[in-house]
């Protein structure tokens, strides 16, 4: 089946002939809106690999209620952004039989740069306010003052208790934290709540204090350049759409996310999620394909057959996806 991405009727014809649509065509704010509309109107589930939370906020506003009423699951952000953070937090919280107060994730990864991701940065002018809102994806009236106070963006360089490393800037924290917070809010509304005033933080993990300082400084400088008109000066030197890491880089890549969770009575657990293959390519392909297959083949998704809306991987796929990822050689471990 072939459909022009700008032709709603063609996209509706495509969506009407399938159960699940998986999209990897970004920037999604440019290419994805009509496709999601077609899926909602024609009754197809949807998943993608976006990290564009301002766009996802628009999907929630436009389509959540209709998708919910039809039992259609629209699940963005099912690549490296944001499954390790979202499903990893879900897995970690599932190890408790009591409410969890906070989870912090510490990311490590090795891989290459993507031209598609670079292009996305250049489509995000004018959305800074939305991107900076820690709860941009939350439903209305789901954030307490305590949660807001403990969820401000920022970072610290300090040795992490129980882990062999130092914390620093989390590269995709501003994308991933918002997704996990939406998961927590939807769990509170529809499934098993994480905890009354649950909060979530995301960080990089580095081998030494010096490495944490240098990497965090470099990342902050990069953020400054790419969030100002200076980005147009460096654009010729950045990967272009269609460019990506070599096969060797993809094969040698990996990611590890380590989660430190504390319950409301101060019980502490440490869990991890590990995948081999470049995070943005090989691992992302595995994560999003398993998400789509879960939507297509599973009859025991969380919430039951009639549950839908603009969801997250934790809320819409949950334990089904954890088990599929385990079978696909993504490792989940309880470390203490």
Please report, for each region that a protein language model flagged, where it lies by residue:
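A generic structural signal for well-ordered alpha-helical segments
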Residues: 35-39, 63, 67, 325
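Adenosine-phosphate binding glycine-rich loop
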Residues: 66, 70-110
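C-terminal catalytic/substrate-binding lobe primarily of soluble NAD(P)-dependent oxidoreductases
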Residues: 93-336
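Rossmann-fold NAD(P)-binding glycine/threonine-rich loop
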Residues: 32, 50-72
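Short glycine/serine/threonine-rich phosphate/pyrophosphate-binding segments
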Residues: 30-32, 57-59, 81-87
């Amino acid at each position: 089946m072939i459909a022009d991405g700008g032709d709603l009727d063609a996209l509706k014809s495509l969506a009407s002939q399938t159960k699940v649509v998986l999209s990897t065509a970004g920037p999604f704010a440019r290419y994805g809106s009509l496709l999601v509309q077609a899926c909602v109107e024609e009754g197809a589930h949807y998943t993608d690999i976006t990290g564009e939370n301002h766009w996802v906020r628009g999907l929630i506003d436009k389509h959540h209620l209709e998708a919910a009423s039809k039992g259609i699951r629209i699940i963005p952000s099912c690549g490296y952004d944001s499954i390790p953070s979202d499903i990893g937090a879900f897995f970690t919280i599932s190890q408790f039989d009591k409410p969890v107060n906070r989870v912090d994730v510490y990311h490590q990864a090795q891989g290459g740069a993507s031209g598609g991701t670079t292009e996305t940065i250049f489509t995000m002018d004018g959305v800074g306010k939305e991107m900076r809102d820690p709860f941009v994806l939350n439903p209305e009236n789901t954030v307490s003052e305590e949660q807001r106070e403990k969820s401000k963006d920022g970072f610290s360089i300090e040795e992490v208790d129980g882990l062999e490393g130092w914390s620093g800037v989390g590269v995709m924290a501003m994308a991933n934290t918002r997704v996990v917070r939406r998961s927590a809010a939807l769990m509170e509304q529809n499934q098993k709540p994480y905890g009354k005033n649950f909060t979530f933080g995301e960080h990089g993990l580095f081998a030494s204090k010096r490495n944490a300082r240098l990497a965090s400084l470099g990342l902050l400088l990069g953020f400054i350049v790419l969030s100002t008109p200076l980005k147009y000066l460096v654009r010729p030197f950045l990967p272009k759409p269609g460019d990506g890491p070599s096969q060797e880089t993809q094969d040698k890549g990996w990611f590890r996310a380590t989660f430190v969770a504390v319950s409301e009575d101060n019980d502490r657990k440490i869990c991890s999620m590990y995948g081999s293959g470049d995070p943005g390519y090989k691992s992302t392909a595995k994560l999003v394909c398993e998400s789509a297959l879960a939507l297509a083949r599973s009859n025991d998704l969380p919430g039951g057959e009639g549950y839908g809306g603009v969801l997250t991987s934790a809320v819409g796929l949950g334990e089904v996806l954890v088990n599929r990822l385990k079978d696909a050689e993504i490792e989940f471990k309880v470390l203490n």
